[in-house]
Amino acid sequence: MAINEPEFATAVAVATKKRTFKKFSFRGFNVDALLKMSNVDLAKLFNARVRRRFYRGLKKQPLILIKKLRRAKKEASDENKMKPEVVKTHLRNMIIVPEMIGSVVGVHNGKKFNEIVIKPEMIGHYLAEFSMTCKKVNHHRPRICGCCCFRRSTRFIPLR
Protein backbone atom coordinates (compact mmCIF):
# COMPACT_ATOMS: atom_id res chain seq x y z
CA MET A 1 0.00 0.00 0.00
CA ALA A 2 1.58 3.23 -1.14
CA ILE A 3 1.00 6.52 0.65
CA ASN A 4 -0.22 9.40 -1.51
CA GLU A 5 1.95 12.53 -1.71
CA PRO A 6 -0.57 14.90 -0.04
CA GLU A 7 -1.22 12.45 2.82
CA PHE A 8 2.53 12.02 3.38
CA ALA A 9 3.07 15.79 3.42
CA THR A 10 0.37 16.32 6.06
CA ALA A 11 1.74 13.44 8.15
CA VAL A 12 5.23 15.00 8.08
CA ALA A 13 3.80 18.43 8.96
CA VAL A 14 1.98 17.00 11.97
CA ALA A 15 5.10 15.11 13.11
CA THR A 16 7.34 18.19 12.87
CA LYS A 17 4.87 20.53 14.56
CA LYS A 18 6.62 22.01 17.59
CA ARG A 19 4.98 22.11 20.96
CA THR A 20 4.10 25.57 22.14
CA PHE A 21 4.23 26.19 25.85
CA LYS A 22 1.85 28.53 27.60
CA LYS A 23 3.53 31.73 28.75
CA PHE A 24 2.93 32.62 32.37
CA SER A 25 0.66 35.55 33.12
CA PHE A 26 -0.44 36.84 36.52
CA ARG A 27 -3.98 38.26 36.37
CA GLY A 28 -3.53 39.00 32.65
CA PHE A 29 -0.04 40.55 32.86
CA ASN A 30 3.15 38.81 31.72
CA VAL A 31 6.32 38.80 33.83
CA ASP A 32 7.97 41.69 31.95
CA ALA A 33 4.96 43.93 32.57
CA LEU A 34 4.91 42.94 36.25
CA LEU A 35 8.59 43.84 36.65
CA LYS A 36 7.95 47.34 35.25
CA MET A 37 4.97 48.03 37.56
CA SER A 38 5.22 50.18 40.67
CA ASN A 39 4.35 48.68 44.06
CA VAL A 40 1.00 50.52 44.14
CA ASP A 41 -0.07 49.16 40.73
CA LEU A 42 1.19 45.70 41.64
CA ALA A 43 -0.74 45.72 44.93
CA LYS A 44 -4.00 46.23 43.02
CA LEU A 45 -3.49 42.82 41.37
CA PHE A 46 -3.06 40.90 44.64
CA ASN A 47 -5.80 39.50 46.87
CA ALA A 48 -7.13 41.52 49.81
CA ARG A 49 -4.80 40.19 52.52
CA VAL A 50 -1.63 40.87 50.48
CA ARG A 51 -2.97 44.17 49.16
CA ARG A 52 -3.59 45.40 52.73
CA ARG A 53 -0.04 44.44 53.69
CA PHE A 54 1.37 46.39 50.73
CA TYR A 55 -0.72 49.47 51.51
CA ARG A 56 0.54 49.49 55.11
CA GLY A 57 4.07 49.72 53.70
CA LEU A 58 7.07 47.43 53.53
CA LYS A 59 9.21 47.45 56.65
CA LYS A 60 13.00 47.50 56.83
CA GLN A 61 13.66 43.73 56.91
CA PRO A 62 11.82 42.81 53.67
CA LEU A 63 13.63 45.63 51.88
CA ILE A 64 16.98 44.32 53.15
CA LEU A 65 16.09 40.84 51.85
CA ILE A 66 15.24 42.23 48.40
CA LYS A 67 18.54 44.15 48.42
CA LYS A 68 20.46 40.92 49.21
CA LEU A 69 18.59 39.06 46.45
CA ARG A 70 19.51 41.79 43.94
CA ARG A 71 23.17 41.52 44.96
CA ALA A 72 23.14 37.71 44.65
CA LYS A 73 21.56 37.91 41.18
CA LYS A 74 24.10 40.51 40.06
CA GLU A 75 27.05 38.41 41.28
CA ALA A 76 25.64 35.34 39.53
CA SER A 77 25.30 37.21 36.23
CA ASP A 78 28.84 38.62 36.58
CA GLU A 79 30.32 35.16 37.14
CA ASN A 80 28.07 33.48 34.51
CA LYS A 81 26.55 31.07 37.02
CA MET A 82 23.31 29.23 36.31
CA LYS A 83 21.72 29.93 39.72
CA PRO A 84 22.35 32.79 42.14
CA GLU A 85 23.72 32.09 45.59
CA VAL A 86 21.29 31.08 48.34
CA VAL A 87 20.11 33.97 50.53
CA LYS A 88 19.04 32.68 53.95
CA THR A 89 16.20 34.35 55.80
CA HIS A 90 13.83 33.95 58.74
CA LEU A 91 11.22 36.18 57.07
CA ARG A 92 8.52 33.60 56.48
CA ASN A 93 5.89 36.33 56.16
CA MET A 94 7.61 37.96 53.16
CA ILE A 95 5.36 38.25 50.10
CA ILE A 96 6.92 37.05 46.85
CA VAL A 97 7.14 39.92 44.35
CA PRO A 98 8.14 39.76 40.65
CA GLU A 99 11.61 41.14 41.40
CA MET A 100 12.43 37.94 43.31
CA ILE A 101 11.85 35.61 40.32
CA GLY A 102 14.87 33.41 39.62
CA SER A 103 16.39 33.90 43.07
CA VAL A 104 17.17 31.10 45.50
CA VAL A 105 15.95 31.75 49.04
CA GLY A 106 16.70 29.64 52.11
CA VAL A 107 13.59 29.90 54.29
CA HIS A 108 13.94 28.82 57.92
CA ASN A 109 11.34 26.30 59.09
CA GLY A 110 12.36 26.28 62.75
CA LYS A 111 15.07 23.66 62.36
CA LYS A 112 16.86 24.21 59.05
CA PHE A 113 16.79 26.37 55.93
CA ASN A 114 14.77 24.97 53.00
CA GLU A 115 16.06 26.17 49.64
CA ILE A 116 13.33 27.55 47.40
CA VAL A 117 13.83 28.62 43.78
CA ILE A 118 11.37 31.46 43.16
CA LYS A 119 9.22 30.87 40.06
CA PRO A 120 6.65 33.18 38.43
CA GLU A 121 3.78 30.99 39.70
CA MET A 122 4.71 31.92 43.29
CA ILE A 123 3.97 35.66 42.94
CA GLY A 124 1.64 36.94 45.66
CA HIS A 125 2.24 34.00 48.02
CA TYR A 126 4.16 34.04 51.29
CA LEU A 127 7.59 32.39 51.59
CA ALA A 128 6.22 30.29 54.47
CA GLU A 129 3.87 28.46 52.11
CA PHE A 130 6.86 26.75 50.49
CA SER A 131 8.76 25.81 53.66
CA MET A 132 6.75 23.45 55.86
CA THR A 133 7.42 23.61 59.60
CA CYS A 134 6.39 20.04 60.35
CA LYS A 135 6.64 16.80 58.47
CA LYS A 136 4.31 13.85 58.22
CA VAL A 137 4.88 11.26 60.93
CA ASN A 138 5.13 7.67 59.76
CA HIS A 139 3.94 5.39 62.55
CA HIS A 140 5.23 1.83 62.36
CA ARG A 141 3.53 -1.19 63.82
CA PRO A 142 5.19 -2.60 66.93
CA ARG A 143 7.29 -5.66 66.22
CA ILE A 144 9.14 -8.32 68.14
CA CYS A 145 12.65 -9.08 67.15
CA GLY A 146 15.65 -10.57 68.89
CA CYS A 147 17.18 -7.24 69.84
CA CYS A 148 16.04 -4.50 72.22
CA CYS A 149 12.91 -3.60 70.19
CA PHE A 150 10.92 -6.06 72.29
CA ARG A 151 11.67 -4.21 75.52
CA ARG A 152 10.74 -0.82 74.02
CA SER A 153 7.38 -1.98 72.67
CA THR A 154 4.45 -0.75 74.74
CA ARG A 155 1.79 -2.83 73.00
CA PHE A 156 1.04 -6.42 73.84
CA ILE A 157 1.54 -8.69 70.86
CA PRO A 158 0.31 -12.24 71.43
CA LEU A 159 2.68 -15.03 70.46
CA ARG A 160 1.51 -17.47 67.84
Swiss-Prot record:
Q: Which PROSITE patterns match?
A: RIBOSOMAL_S19
GO molecular function ontology, one term from the record: RNA binding
Q: State the organism of origin.
A: Arabidopsis thaliana (Mouse-ear cress)
Q: Where in the cell is it found?
A: Cytoplasm
The record ties this protein, via Pfam families, to: Ribosomal_S19
Matching InterPro entries: Ribosomal_uS19 (IPR002222), Ribosomal_uS19_CS (IPR020934), Ribosomal_uS19_euk/arc (IPR005713), Ribosomal_uS19_SF (IPR023575)
Q: Please name the SUPFAM superfamilies in this protein's record.
A: Ribosomal protein S19
Which HAMAP family does this one have?
Ribosomal_uS19
An annotated GO BP:
translation
State the GO CC annotations: cytosolic small ribosomal subunit
Provide this UniProt record's keywords sorted from A to Z. Cytoplasm, Ribonucleoprotein, Ribosomal protein
Per its record, how is this protein called by name?
A: Small ribosomal subunit protein uS19v
Q: Which family does it belong to?
A: Belongs to the universal ribosomal protein uS19 family.
